[in-house]
């Protein structure tokens, strides 16, 4: 399994960031590779289950994710039920400057026949994609938030 690990500081209320990220409909807005989110349903344990179409290395993959753990304003974990085998763990923490978001992803590159070199390139692209997504979230959340010294 490939692993990604990113942390970002967002100068916005934690509750605002969590609420935005808890709605899968918002993912394509900040995550260019997430082409579509559909059939979103409430999970009985909190959070949402949803289907998606994702672009990895120019190939489109359809899948579905379900909530594995949902602790409001603290942690949200999803795992795939079909499609790309993955687990996303989002951890939220209040800090003096706003909030810290930690993203940890484990996933299986879905193309076993491409060879090790191509797999390394795809993993680097996905790492870059995750970083861009977090910065897009930061930009989106910091809009209309007063900056205080």
Question: Which residue stretches match the model-derived regions?
Answer:
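A short, structured loop/turn motif at beta-sheet edges
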Residues: 14-15, 42-45, 69-73, 91-100
